[in-house]
């Protein structure tokens, strides 16, 4: 009997031990399952969007993260485009490198030459992804020798913005904005009075590039650096001279307001009635319409008389994949990029920011049509882009020293207000930028 009881006790103990062991194994398996469920591929995304733009971007990222369970995109603000590029230089190729990075359009040549990026063309080819759904006049900028290097994201172009109320007061038709230089000069004369000016351009190199390209003028040789390595500038021909002469003449006639280099100052001057017409980015149209205490009109970039309109170059930025990161992360980033370019996401992006939709199908969605009914000015910006002819001029120039070049142009523009002859100012900028190009070749 005692033996039987002892056996029973031992058996009970063993059962108890086995029961606890099974429970432990079960819990461990559950924990592993949970870990497998929550483990996602992380995509660190560096960007330069701030304020309302960052809010709109974060909404897109949050929606993507919630739409699937395998990828987690982490947006990280890195300051201005220039600041972000400086930080990229410090970490590219290291474990601290992001997977995805937003870089401004003039950084294209630099990024390609860095050797640290993976062209999105790789994933386009592997998947047979249809890029015809993307706006060709935007994609063209980031296409070099048939390879699409980055995915267009926030793109804009320049437009003429004008005060319709001021037009009426001056006896001008508010529905017929100036389309040529002679019309611009004539309208500016009628609009200039009582300390208020007819026209202004921000002292910013981008606007010079645009006024050059709309005429078909090239910024540098070798077909704007698209056929081969650019070795010297080409902007100091008749097209560039026309731009400088326009500014010089209007300033000396007293119809042009020197607004400086600050975007906020420029927009504030327009809203206060200091000038009746100026050039701005298409991305700023809605904000201007909302904040101006008068009716705002938007039109195409004016061109010289008797010159055929070629179109505009896109500005803004694109998304770049890093080369030296895990393939899994690159594929995850590509999934996010595809999501971003869907019509639904692009429609929301266009409505919330004013940037163009990379996927034009977005313009057919109700959310955009409703926005255009409220802001018909946005349609003008889209139409100007659609009507742009694909040429080396409108593709934009490819040079690695673009930031420096822009500053040289700014200095040249400012010298016009000091009485420097337009041709002399243009040649001085050309010589300085040619030296920069020569130095870049030696690095």
Regions found by a protein language model. Name each.
Residues 1-44, 66, 424-427, 431-443:
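Short, low-complexity disordered leader/linker segments with a strong preference
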Residues 187-190, 229-259:
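Glycine-centered hinge/linker elements that transmit conformational signals in sensory
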Residues 66-67, 72-74, 89, 170, ...:
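Extracytoplasmic/periplasmic substrate-recognition and gating elements
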Residues 63-134, 169-171, 269, 276-277, ...:
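Extracytoplasmic "Venus flytrap"/periplasmic binding protein-like
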Residues 38-50, 71-76, 99-100, 149, ...:
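Short, well-ordered beta-strand elements
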Residues 377-432:
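C-terminal capping/gating helix-and-loop segments adjacent to ligand/active sites or protein-protein/ligand interfaces
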Residues 104-162, 185, 201, 209-214, ...:
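Hinge/lid segment of periplasmic solute-binding proteins
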Residues 50-72, 409:
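Short, polar/charged alpha-helical segment
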């Amino acid at each position: 009997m005692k033996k039987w009881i002892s056996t029973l006790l031992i058996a009970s103990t063993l059962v108890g031990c086995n029961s606890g062991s099974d429970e432990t194994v079960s819990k461990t398996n559950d924990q592993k399952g949970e870990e497998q469920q929550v483990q996602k591929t992380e995509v660190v995304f560096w960007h330069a969007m701030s304020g309302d733009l960052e809010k709109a971007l974060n909404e897109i990222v949050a929606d993507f993260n919630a739409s699937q369970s395998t990828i987690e995109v982490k947006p990280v603000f890195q300051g201005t485009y220039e600041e972000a590029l400086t930080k990229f230089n410090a970490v590219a190729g290291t474990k601290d490198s992001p997977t995805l990075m937003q870089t401004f359009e003039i950084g294209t040549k630099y990024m390609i030459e860095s050797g640290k990026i993976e062209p999105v063309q790789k994933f386009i080819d592997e998947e047979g992804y249809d890029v015809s759904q993307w706006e060709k006049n935007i994609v063209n900028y980031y296409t070099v020798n048939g390879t699409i290097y980055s995915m267009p994201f926030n793109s804009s172009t320049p437009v003429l913005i004008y005060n319709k109320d001021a037009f009426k007061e001056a006896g001008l038709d508010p529905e017929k904005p100036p389309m040529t230089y002679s019309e611009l000069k004539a309208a500016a004369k009628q609009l200039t009075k009582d300390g208020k000016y007819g026209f202004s351009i921000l002292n910013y190199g981008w606007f010079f590039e645009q006024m050059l390209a709309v005429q078909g003028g090239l910024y540098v040789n070798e077909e704007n650096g698209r056929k081969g390595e650019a070795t010297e500038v080409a902007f100091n021909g008749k097209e560039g001279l026309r731009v400088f002469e326009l500014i010089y003449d209007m300033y000396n006639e007293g119809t042009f307001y020197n607004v400086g280099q600050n975007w906020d100052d420029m927009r504030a001057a327009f809203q206060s009635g200091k000038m009746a017409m100026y050039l701005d980015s298409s991305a700023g149209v809605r904000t201007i319409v909302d904040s101006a205490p008068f009716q705002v009109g938007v039109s195409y970039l004016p061109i010289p008389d008797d010159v055929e309109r070629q179109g505009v170059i896109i500005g803004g930025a694109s998304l770049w994949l890093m080369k030296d990161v895990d393939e899994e992360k690159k594929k995850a980033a590509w999934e996010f990029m595809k999501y971003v370019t869907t019509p639904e996401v692009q429609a929301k992006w266009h409505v919330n920011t004013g940037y163009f939709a990379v996927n034009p199908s977005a313009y057919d969605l109700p959310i955009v049509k409703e926005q255009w009914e409220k802001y018909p000015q946005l349609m003008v910006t889209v139409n100007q882009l659609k009507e742009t002819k694909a040429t080396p001029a409108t593709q934009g120039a490819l040079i690695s020293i673009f930031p420096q070049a822009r500053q040289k142009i700014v200095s040249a523009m400012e010298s016009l207000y000091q009485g420097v002859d337009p041709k002399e100012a243009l040649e001085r900028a050309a010589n300085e930028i040619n030296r920069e190009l020569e130095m870049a070749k030696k690095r």
